[in-house]
Amino acid sequence: MAVEEEGLRVFQSVRIKIGEAKNLPSYPGPNKMRDCYCTVNLDQEEVFRTKIVEKSLCPFYGEDFYCEIPRSFRHLSFYIFDRDVFRRDSIIGKVAIQKEDLQRYHNRDTWFQLQHVDADSEVQGKVHLELRLSEVITDTGVVCHKLAARIFECQGLPIVNGQCDPYATVTLAGPFRSEAKKTKVKKKTNNPQFDEVFYFEVTRPCSYSKKSHFDFEEEDVDKLEIRVDLWNASNLKFGDEFLGELRLPLKILRHSSSYEAWYFLQPRDNGNKSLKPDDLGSLRLNVVYTEDHVFSSEYYSPLRDLLLKSADVEPVSASAAHILGEVCRDKQEAAIPLVRLLLHYGRVVPFISAIASAEVKRTQDPNTIFRGNSLTSKCIDETMKLAGMHYLHVTLKPTIEEICQSHKSCEIDPVKLKDGENLENNMESLRQYVDRIFTVITKSGVSCPTVMCDIFFSLREAAAKRFQDDLDVRYTAVSSFIFLRFFAPAILSPNLFQLTPHHTDPQTSRTLTLISKTIQTLGSLSKSKSASFKESYMATFYEFFNEQKYADAVKNFLDLISSSGRRDPKSIEQPILLKEGFMIKRAQGRKRFGMKNFKKRWFRLTNHEFTYQKSKGDQPLCNIPIENILAVERLEEESFRMKNMFQVIQPERALYIQANNCVEAKDWIDILTKVSQCNQKRLTVFHPSAYLNGHWLCCRASSDTAAGCTPCTGGLPANIQLDIDGDRETERIYSLFNLYMGKLEKMQEACGSKSVYDGPEQEEYSTFVIDDPQETYKTLKQVIAGVGTLEQEHAQYRRDKFKKTRYGSQEHPIGDKSFQNYIRQQSEISTHSI
């Protein structure tokens, strides 16, 4: 799902590493320690929460979070909470990064000072206001000026303690006067529609005879202002809560009798500034924010075609895809969009086979094969993440969940044993876990995804051809990925592979570390097992597995997953879990009478059906076959005055569901839409609002079977692979090429230098792999031309958008400093281009 903007789609995403907090204020009690967690918020909407770290003022979280951002936002915020068992969790402090500042911290570990949180720091939202100055004749026949202040609506007000019942006060204030008026309270909404007008007398009637038409006294104008304050009506004894304010000097009407615009709400001038930022501690974050502006598909044809034929270029180092890996600062930065694009078009196996073969030819020692962070390694890693996640979950998740729930101690380091623990018992528990995981892995070969098997086959063939005297290299070439870079990391950090929702507790983490080390060594088939461990206790423990049957099992498994033409005939019939989690659903109304209330349920989606039950593991209360899903669409907030709602439309009724936040709502809508995309009876129109009180709220039709009034969203073509958009990935690659244009040009120079000079290579060119200077130069020329054409399209789009942009519109309210900077930059660009 993307924001549509006149011929192009805008995608936003963010990848966050929440590291640790330092020097949090101590708890005011004898213990002084705190139980803290961190939340990630789009403005104030929570979209992710870390685990709770107990009894620490320097909690380490070590959690990663990625999401597609489905709406506009101003701040990416992080709140540190202190858990309270008996009361509401209290906020220690927050970090708020403006959207426009995210690039300053792009992919860098940064320490941020925690800021104090109060009503002023939480101000958000915008207000639509009109001021109109007019002349009126009083009862005595005297003409005077009246000011009409019309407040239309507000959007995106903060929600306070789970509710928002807003009202506004409109005040005309000056040195010697203050006249306030108040709107009605709007219940249960943070997007109130007020549409109320308030009138104020601006000048004395006697002043009219001294001034010309609309030329009222300057001293009054300069000193008067309109102030709009938003409040949340509260029943608490502490009074109503401040939501934000707007101050407008009346002199804006000096040149026009009316003024209408949208404004961002601001904190009060006298906001609480008592605490210094460093009083609250700091938080370490790594944030990667990406915004892609994607044109229609034909714009990307030249660059996309160049990338897709990379596997056929001789040598492969002269291909566009390989060049991308050469110029990017981080190979993974290149691998992510590259693999997704090639996987989408069925070209990932030929390309990886080509670059793997080239890398093997450059490798001198079979013991170091595929051990570096090369483009080959990163591309295979990314392919395994995309294609192998379900395989990984089916293989490991049941045992990992059992380990996390059992909390058995498996510590085998005598130095780290706790009082009362028995070394032999711990060693036996660990041995059983390792044995179980080793068995499920080595028996899972038939379930390994085909694309992974095809890649492993090419690795095996290339390694065996290069090192013909080493009989084990055909195994180590494959095990270096499937064990060392797939299974072992997933066991070590299961949260990074969605095997657990959060980082595991210290004891479980230690158990998983020991298991991961052992599995990694078993899979590596190294000649000297004991020498693989630095710790003597690990060498002792490994004696349990120093039998030929374990090596044979590994080799049989590696043979199976690297065999040519291997296919899993059962893979299509197997139910694949795609997504699950708690949401709130509205009763479907199978009975004609009775309350249709909202209930929290555990939802589960597979490639066969969509179900919900009371709790995870219970029997389903409702099963919806995928073929019965006719459409999945958003539900307008006005239907039930609830945010983040969507509807799953079936032949007889619609199931109304509320997700926990906007990110989850987008994820569920996307995956439900994609999994039901091929249904033959999919609807073309739908009702965007609910059927309540005998009619549809959107079109007022009275029949509950009336045809929809709004076209269904198009979704993606039926043959598209899940979660991959080829045009978006090409746009991402274009952005990388454009970012590293200087390196592309430097690489061109290196090709020219190599073509005419056979002497020692210049140091500045030595970082590039250039096997054929002429072929590489030819590709570089095509890449630079394709990137240049796309850059011209982007520049034209920016110019067109700038011409249409109005400061003070609903999209660009007044009060956004970053937008003012954007206006200034675009003005300079436009002037320069002229």
From Swiss-Prot:
Tissue: High levels in brain, lower in spleen and lung.
Sites of Phosphoserine modification: 77, 809, 833
Positions where Phosphotyrosine occurs in the chain: 66
Keyword Magnesium assigned: no
Binding-site list for Zn(2+): 687, 698-699, 709
GO cellular component entries: cytoplasmic side of plasma membrane
Domain C2: residue ranges: 1-112, 123-263
Molecular-function annotations in GO: calcium channel regulator activity; GTPase activator activity; zinc ion binding
Site feature (Arginine finger) residues: 371
Gene3D superfamilies: C2 domain, GTPase Activation - p120gap, domain 1, Pleckstrin-homology domain (PH domain)/Phosphotyrosine-binding domain (PTB)
InterPro entries: C2_dom, C2_domain_sf, PH-like_dom_sf, PH_domain, Ras_GTPase, RASA3_PH, RasGAP_CS, RasGAP_dom
Annotated keywords: Acetylation, GTPase activation, Metal-binding, Phosphoprotein, Repeat, Zinc, Zinc-finger
Zinc finger (Btk-type): 679-715
Ras-GAP domain segment(s): 346-561
Disulfide pairings: none
GO biological process: cellular response to heat; intracellular signal transduction; negative regulation of Ras protein signal transduction; platelet activation
Residue positions where Phosphothreonine is found in the record: 110
Domain PH: 576-677
PTM annotation (N-acetylalanine): residues: 2
Function according to Swiss-Prot or TrEMBL: Inhibitory regulator of the Ras-cyclic AMP pathway. May bind inositol tetrakisphosphate (IP4).
The name this protein goes by in its record: Ras GTPase-activating protein 3
